[in-house]
Each structure stands twice: as C-alpha cells, then as structure tokens.
Amino acid sequence: MRVLVRDLKAHVGQEVELLGFLHWRRDLGRIQFLLLRDRSGVVQVVTGGLKLPLPESALRVRGLVVENAKAPGGLEVQAKEVEVLSPALEPTPVEIPKEEWRANPDTLLEYRYVTLRGEKARAPLKVQAALVRGFRRYLDRQDFTEIFTPKVVRAGAEGGSGLFGVDYFEKRAYLAQSPQLYKQIMVGVFERVYEVAPVWRMEEHHTSRHLNEYLSLDVEMGFIADEEDLMRLEEALLAEMLEEALNTAGDEIRLLGATWPSFPQDIPRLTHAEAKRILKEELGYPVGQDLSEEAERLLGEYAKERWGSDWLFVTRYPRSVRPFYTYPEEDGTTRSFDLLFRGLEITSGGQRIHRYEELLESLKAKGMDPEAFHGYLEVFKYGMPPHGGFAIGAERLTQKLLGLPNVRYARAFPRDRHRLTP
C-alpha cells in the first residue's frame, strides 16, 4: 500500500511503497541519491546500480525507512526496488529544484504545465483552494445555497463594454462578465445564494493586477436593511476564509514568506466623498469621480497608518460610476462599497434596486436597452425582496495575501491580453 512522504515518520524501520516524481538526482557511482517528490513533500532515496532517468520521471520506490539526520526531514528510504512508471523524455525547460518563481515570468507562464510542479509555484493554488473552501463552508452554515449560472449570455450585466463576443449558432452571444443578473433572480428563489465560477472581462490592461479571466466568489442575500448588512457578512466571511487557509495551507503560506494580516472585527469605513477629501487635502492627490489604482494604494497606506488595518471599505460611490442595478440615494450616491485590501480593490458590492419601475428607469438613464434584459426585468414584476451582494476576486485576494509580484501567479493557467496558452 502506498505511503505518502509526510507519513513516513510513522513507518521508521518498516518497508514502504512510495509513488512520485524524481525531483533531483546525484550519481556517485556505486551509490546514488534521489529526491522523490509526491503531493505531500520530498524524501531522500538511496539506491545504486541504476540507469537514472531524467528529473520529473514518475517512479515507484519500495524500500526501508530509516532515520538520517543529514537527509531532508531527518529520514531516508533505502531502496530495494525502483521502477520507472513513466520516463521524462527531455530535460525540463526550468529546473524544478532550483525554482526561482519570482524571476522570468514569461518563461514560468509559457511552461506552466511543468513549472507548476515546483513547490513555490503551486503553493498559491493550494492557499486559494483553502480560501474557497472557507468561503463555501461559512456560507453553507449561514443557509446560503450554491448556484450555477450560465456563462454564455445574451447581454452583459454591466452593459455592452468589456464583453467577449462568441458565435452562438445564428445569434451573437457573450461570455459572462458577472453572474449578477442571475444571482439576483435566484434571490427570489432561495433568498441567499452564492457562486464560485470564472468570469471574463475584455479589458486592454496588461498589468500585474489584471486578468481577462478570473475566479469570482459571488454572494447575494435577500431581505437586507441596507449595504451595512452585506459588509458585516463579508467581515465574518473573510475571517473564516483566512482561518481556513492558515489552518490547512500554513506550510505553503510560510514557504512563501507571507505576512498574514490581522483581521479587525470592524473594518474601517470611509465614504467615497471622505476618501476624495483625504486624498486631496491630506495626501495631496486629487481624484475624479472614480478612484484610480494609485488612489486605492494611497488609501491602503492611510488605513494602515491611521487604524493599523490592512482593510478598508470605501462606501457610497456616486451613481455615475456604479452599474444600473445599484440602489440610489437622493443625494446622487449609492448604497455601494468596495473593499480595499493592502491598497487593492478585491471586492465590489452593494444593495440593488428591487422595484420594477425604478430598475427600468435606471436602465434607460444609463442608455441601455431594456429589451436586452427582458428575462431579468420580468422577475421584478412579481415581487423581489430588498437585496444585495458582492463579489470577491479570488486571484487578487490570493496575490495580496501572499505578496505575489503578479496576479498571474495566483491562477494555474492565466488568460491576459496576450496569453491564450497553455
């Protein structure tokens, strides 16, 4: 029966079978040292007289587990049998044991199918999986229902910009930029819903913080009083996500040298107007209606200095910079918010309009065609609760938590302005 590397300590003095990849090799003639890597770690294997295959070959090893203080982890396996299950046919383009994951991003991404085998390259994905697990678990406990919405749609949730068009038989369709309209519809069914799924944005940006395809963690909740209910929910949700990652992916977090954030019980809040005033009067950085990347970075520094917080809610954005479905106030603001983490927007959310006439008026005011949203609008003729929600960008959150230099390292196979493979 197979034993994982992490469990070898319980088998000292016993014969075991290991399955994994040849991580490294050293041939001293009569004696040969191998490092065997499986999903749980690396162990030294001592053998001799073999014609050693290339690194990354898949192996089966049968041998005796013994203690050796000089070996990685203090253990080694003295092999009695080594079988090559699948040989590597050529050297890897990047040496996995000498992994330098912060350098040469084009090379690392071009050969992602190999470089992901490196422990530092795969660590962000392990952390992200834990974050998503915490996301699901917390919402399940709060009586949310997971939903699965269409990804080929007739119109975008936020209008006609930023959409990837696709041919859908004799019609024109688009890749979904958000499940927004569907999750609102499903609030009328389950009251509380969430989805974990990819979304697409056709944006020309080619920066360390932008992806054209990313994993969106979406939440929508009915019968709320206002957007404050949503921010309170997100505070508790993020706390559980961070705890799950720390508890189950702590080795990966430490491997990357990440500074794990403290999580305040109450995230500081600034209205959009207050944020603009602080930027202009205290930080010397005037801004327009929306906040630029630099403005968000400065606000992140301000929150850290003033409150000791890595997190900051910016609330009450102007109606002009929010989607048509955002609940408006009479003063021209909206019941909306963004969550900044270490100076980067990772969440956008707010309360939605829940009355048919007001929603129709808002669509027209934005210059959008109500007919394109017919199925969505019809739902509001039959009663909808006051509701709202938010979406967390999984890759951005992972990037900032781990201090990754590029958001592409937080996705297994990233899609950006220039990358369509692998």
From Swiss-Prot:
Function: Aspartyl-tRNA synthetase with relaxed tRNA specificity since it is able to aspartylate not only its cognate tRNA(Asp) but also tRNA(Asn) with similar efficiencies. Reaction proceeds in two steps: L-aspartate is first activated by ATP to form Asp-AMP and then transferred to the acceptor end of tRNA(Asp/Asn).
Gene Ontology annotations of biological process type: aspartyl-tRNA aminoacylation
Residue(s) at site: Interaction with tRNA: R26, Q44, N68, E76
Region annotation (Aspartate) ranges: 180-183
Entry's EC annotation: 6.1.1.23
Organism in which the protein naturally occurs: Thermus thermophilus (strain ATCC 27634 / DSM 579 / HB8)
Catalytic reaction annotation: tRNA(Asx) + L-aspartate + ATP = L-aspartyl-tRNA(Asx) + AMP + diphosphate
Upregulation: Constitutively expressed in a constant ratio along the growth of the bacterium.
Signal peptide from the UniProt entry: none
Binding site for ATP: R201, M202, E203, R209, H210, L211, E345, G393, A394, E395, R396
Binding locations of L-aspartate: E158, R201, S348, R352
InterPro entries: Aa-tRNA-synt_II, aa-tRNA-synth_II, aa-tRNA-synth_II/BPL/LPL, Asp-tRNA_synthase_2, Asp/Asn-tRNA-synth_IIb, NA-bd_OB-fold, NA-bd_OB_tRNA
The keyword Magnesium appears for this protein: no
Lineage: Bacteria, Thermotogati, Deinococcota, Deinococci, Thermales
Protein family (similarity comment): Belongs to the class-II aminoacyl-tRNA synthetase family. Type 2 subfamily.
Name this polypeptide is given: Aspartate--tRNA(Asp/Asn) ligase
